[in-house]
Amino acid sequence: MILQSKRVWILNQWMEAQIEVSTESGKIEGICSYGSRQADMDFGELRVVPGFIDVHTHGAYGFDTNDAEEEGLRNWAQNIVSEGVTGFLPTTITQSEEVLTKALKNVAKVAREQKADRDSVPGAEILGIHLEGTYLSQKYKGAQPEEFCVKPDLEQFKRYFDASDGLIRIVTLACENDEGYQMTRFLNENGIVASLGHSSATCAQAAMAFANGARSVTHVYNGMAPFHHREPGIPGAAFRFKDVFGEIICDGLHSDWSAVYTFFTCKGPDHGVMVSDALRFKGLPVGTRMLFGGNLVELYEDGSAHLVDSGTLAGSTLKINEGLRNLVEKAGVPWQTAINACTLNPARLIGMERTKGSLQAGKDADIVVLREDYSVETIFCRGRN
């Protein structure tokens, strides 16, 4: 199958090009000049970009990762392609070991089925799991249930890792509670990303965590001590150390656009990662109330979700294609930085850049075609439309 457009994102620029896709292998077989062969699909001036990857998303359409329900997870994977997502990490919230173990086993089961037969679980590919908690600061817990926020426990984590079939790719933790940085070092040694978040760490403590193998920061600005010119905290460390990745929620509610612009100016085109941090409310009517981590949460008209009892911001319902639009149109971020933030950089973060994240021969045919308003015209997940 041959696709073509006059605006294909290749080698960090827009080019007129054809993409040859194998529907059998799900790979990009080659990229050629526009019009060089008869195209099966000609998208004219529509933008063609790599498939989006969301490495921090709790759920959507009424489902939450912690629910441990197969059908909910399948429905989620099938529907998030509507926003251009071709790969994602179902993300847990802090809870009891029993609840988390069931959730991890559920994701692992569905992911195994999808890997064995991609038609059995159509839609976006489950690329792993993001374990957000339980190793978080009680002070900066946000909407996470406080009673389950505990210090890092290496033996417990090993049980979680086994339950996940080795699918845990990212662990968010409060590094100030990681005695001797044992958990951080263990994660790094085993190819798992230690990401600082929901933490009261100082800039110096964050720097030591990076020196011990931490590689990322979870939703920069949120769930941590704020940046101050005398104590810049985790945000300051994320800005200073260029090789560290940083997530950011680009909905205009979690962070002001000037703060988003500052973040990407500091991180450049290679280390900023856009995430949705979406809750089960995505795709549901305004005013819906549901439990999140045992707490009652309500969906507001602006797309944000808040704890009913305290009004605390609990998460978002951001769609990744809308986040891309926000980066370009509202935050004023350059195209290369904006596109990389939802494609190549998340792939690099989780060590999948050899097969994901860019339009290149030999990589998976994860392709999104965007209209002028950034809505999705069509999508290919591993070559399947």
Regions found by a protein language model. Name each.
Residues 1-49:
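Histidine-rich, glycine-flanked metal-binding segment
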Residues 158, 162-286:
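Active-site core of metal-dependent hydrolases
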Residues 78-89, 137-165, 208-220, 231-245, ...:
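Active-site gating loops and adjacent loop-to-helix segments of metal-dependent hydrolytic enzymes
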Residues 6, 26, 45, 56, ...:
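Divalent metal-coordination and catalytic microenvironments
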Residues 58, 74-106, 123-137, 164-176, ...:
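Divalent metal-dependent hydrolysis catalytic cores, especially in the metallo-beta-lactamase
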Residues 104-132, 139-203:
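Metal-dependent enolase-superfamily TIM-barrel catalytic cores that perform enediolate-based chemistry
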Residues 46-48, 55, 65-124, 148-163, ...:
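Alpha-helical scaffold segments that flank or form the walls of functional sites
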Residues 233-246, 264-276, 282-363, 367-370:
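His/Asp/Glu-enriched, well-ordered alpha-helical/loop segment
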